[in-house]
Amino acid sequence: MWFKNLQLHRLPAPWKVSVEQMEKWLAPHAFQPANSVETTRQGWTSPRNNGSLVYSINQQMLITYRAEKKLLPASVVTQVTKARALELEEQQGFKPGRKQMRDLKEQVTDELLPRAFSIQRDTRVWIDTVNGWLVIDAASQALGDDVLGLLVKSVDRLPISSVRVAQAPVAAMTNWLLAGEGPVNFTLDQDTELRSPAEGNATVRYVGHALEADDMRRHIEAGKQCMRLAMTWNDRVSFVMTPSLTIKRVTALDVIKEASDPTAQNDDEQFDSDFTLMTGELAKLFDGVVDALGGELDEGSKAA
């Protein structure tokens, strides 16, 4: 159940909001399947499929965003529209004009939508009301923006802000590669990407390859900067850091997996244990990442 890709946002620490209040905010935006003429739908759904829109334990909340999309290939619409256009041409004795073609396409789309397949995708959101984190489990920035957009619409005056650190992640990652070692409690793994900001964006990627200090220095002296860096925190969690501070490819290592509660009697107890373990470890990881980047900035301060 561990989150894999972490888009981080800040909340007040602590954020004094109850589960009941959160349920009240989300309920008007609960997910409902798209009707016959809609191509997309979004809303909140139960994280545990028990009717509740908010799962909570130890002041850690979990909510789930669901998006539905109808699959209606443009090629199918075009094919049917062309066939209808030929029929119309025979009836009226001349080819349909632009407006007629546009109307035909809209008509065909409306007719085909009820028969279109639909897909639903869920995206999880963790709200740490104690330490003031809001975390979206999404690799795509566009998806994260969609989730955040609905959350802002749902929650009355959501007190959210971006994470602002003293040192830009690109500069920090580049310096760590130059030094050949990570900051305190972090080790460098064997995946990285270096890219030149100059025209052409010359890029070098290392995957499962030792990051030799001489090689790193040569690339950096040539003007390249580190854009992705695989790291491990405290021998407990491995991940990839990015320029936007999105933490990707999060993996709990064996020492954490072994800490999972062996006495759990059912799925609910196991979920409680796993979620508590994940939120506790990741909250400490976030503190470590922020410290490694020089700490958080006050409003109005600029990153180095």
From Swiss-Prot:
GO terms for biological process: DNA recombination; regulation of DNA recombination. The keyword Cytoplasm applies. Keywords: Cytoplasm, DNA recombination. GO terms for cellular component: bacterial nucleoid; cytoplasm. Transmembrane segments: none annotated. It is found in: Cytoplasm, Nucleoid. GO terms for molecular function: double-stranded DNA binding. Its main location: cytoplasm. Pfam families: RdgC. It comes from the Bacteria. Disulfide bonds: none annotated. Coiled coil: none annotated. InterPro entries: RdgC. May be involved in recombination. Belongs to the RdgC family. PANTHER family: RECOMBINATION-ASSOCIATED PROTEIN RDGC. This is Recombination-associated protein RdgC. It comes from Paraburkholderia phymatum (strain DSM 17167 / CIP 108236 / LMG 21445 / STM815) (Burkholderia phymatum).
